[in-house]
């Protein structure tokens, strides 16, 4: 009977990106992690917001087991692209099978959003594992860009902070922006019933670090409670544009074997 390899206790290597967020963590996630090592990973995640574990060789079970250490796993509402036998894993892909059908969600990340902000209790984090990465002329494609909305909030003019204090934006999954001709399947009536409008504070306090962040995107926020639409929609657009200023961004360039967590 094989015995799982157990890592020895050493400080984990964390290399920060030259950006407003992001870091690489040098840990082999296929090994059994002690509670102390996991605590270091968790702290690095909280400090850097987006973390990447390079050169991973994970089974589906290992991917799920590591993810579960951060909390209860969710099943994505788009059931069509759940990995058979592993419903905790959603396939992201633009590859088509022999019948010409997409094998995964092809437009994920095409617009700015915060995962599952349309739920009453949004996800704590997401973990995306790169099994294949497209290339053209030797250059990897499909970069993913992230925004540090903590830094964005902290840099807001004082007048804007006062304007949004105590306000709640209305998130609507069915209004998420789509690229023209998006192949994403439309939600059924039952799925729409699962995702009613949800209001979250525009300035959201992180439950683990206590830091304040902007929590609003033009991609799926349709209004602000108690504010007329002719004022709310421009304000949402203004905050959205502020969050994605270059000084708040990190661009992740994918490699096969990356496990990216945000």
Tell where the protein language model's regions lie, with residue ranges:
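Non-heme Fe(II) oxygenase catalytic core, chiefly the N-lobe of the double-stranded beta-helix
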Residues: 2-259
């Amino acid at each position: 009977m094989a015995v799982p390899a157990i890592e020895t206790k050493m400080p984990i290597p964390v290399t920060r990106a030259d950006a407003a967020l992001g870091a690489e963590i040098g840990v082999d996630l296929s090994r059994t992690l002690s509670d102390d090592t996991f605590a270091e990973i968790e702290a690095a995640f909280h400090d850097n917001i987006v973390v990447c574990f390079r050169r991973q060789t994970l089974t589906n079970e290992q991917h799920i087991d590591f993810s579960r250490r951060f909390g209860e796993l969710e099943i994505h509402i788009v059931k069509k692209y759940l990995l058979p036998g592993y419903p905790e894993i959603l396939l992201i892909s633009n590859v088509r099978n022999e019948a010409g059908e997409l094998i995964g969600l092809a437009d994920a990340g095409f617009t700015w959003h915060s995962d599952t902000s349309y739920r009453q209790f949004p996800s704590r984090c997401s973990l995306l594992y790169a099994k294949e990465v497209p290339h053209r002329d030797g250059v990897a494609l499909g970069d993913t860009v992230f925004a540090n909305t903590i830094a964005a909030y902290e840099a807001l003019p004082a007048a804007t902070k006062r304007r949004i204090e105590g306000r709640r934006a209305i998130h609507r999954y069915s209004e998420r922006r789509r690229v023209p001709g998006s192949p994403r399947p439309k939600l059924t009536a039952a799925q729409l019933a699962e995702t009613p409008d949800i209001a979250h504070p525009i300035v959201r306090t992180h439950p683990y670090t206590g830091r304040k962040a902007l929590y609003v995107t033009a991609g799926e926020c349709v209004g602000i409670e108690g504010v007329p639409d002719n004022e709310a929609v421009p304000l949402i657009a203004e905050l959205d544009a502020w969050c994605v200023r270059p000084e708040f961004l990190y661009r992740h360039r994918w490699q096969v074997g990356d496990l990216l967590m945000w």
